[in-house]
Amino acid sequence: MGWADAALTSPVTGLPLLADTAHSLAGGSERWPVLEGIPFLRADRRSLADAALAALDAGDTEPALVLLLGDQDNWARTPPPDEASRRAVVRDAGHISFRDAMDRLAFGAVGAYFAHRWSDPTFLSGLALAEAHWAAPARVFELACGAGHYLREFARAGANAVGGDIVFSKLWLARHWVAGPAPNLVCFDADAPWPFAAEADLAFCHDALYFFNDKPYVATRLLAAAGQGTVLLSHIHNRAWPNFSSGAAITLPEILELFPQATLYDDH
């Protein structure tokens, strides 16, 4: 887990989590699965975590991975992929494309969004924001990192990058097709207690703030994660402006309540 290694904690009890096997973390009587270096720490998915752990403890990595690849967030617009498709994407991961993998995982419109993200104006505006405030951070944390597009850019710039997302399959895609092995990845729910307390020089969140239910809590944790560094939020969405996205956007006055010292830019 790189710089966050010593700070991993249970999202349920807050106890420190340490590796007890090559595929699990333990704290007190709790254990959590780790697949392909990605800890699965969703507090609201305890039964799923236990099922994946049982498979891993039995030496069955593929069934554990197939289980976690079927998990989604509450805003998903498509049904989860069936088990046969999940097994196929695990089996063929070494020789299929990024787009093929997302199709098999039933990403739907999100797959198109990720496939074309490199040229998406909102992605480019996020890059411009990061470049405008870049101060050679040694440690970067990205919340809701998705398939790892920004993580790859941060890692290429020499930062020690850590990404967190609520959907395990997105992190798995980041590891295999987009961000590669360099960034450290954690699967957790940002509306629940965060499973780490380490500080980064830059805390970044793009095109996701409107998805969180407890925005004041998430804002507090982002500020804490940045410590004495910088928090950058891009493509926040303004509820007063028509759009067709999922989530629960807020207005500019509400954004300023969350980040009263913020500098605001028009997202054009």
Where in the sequence are the language-model features?
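Conserved class I S-adenosyl-L-methionine
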Residues: 137-146
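Class I SAM-dependent methyltransferase SAM/SAH-binding core
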Residues: 147-192
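A short acidic, Gly/Pro-enriched loop at the edge of an enzyme's catalytic core
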Residues: 194-203
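A short SAM/SAH-binding and catalytic strip from SAM-dependent methyltransferases
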Residues: 202-214
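A short glycine-rich, Lys/Arg-flanked "PGG" loop and its adjoining helix->strand segment in the class I
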Residues: 216-229
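Acceptor-substrate binding/catalytic loop of class I
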Residues: 239-254
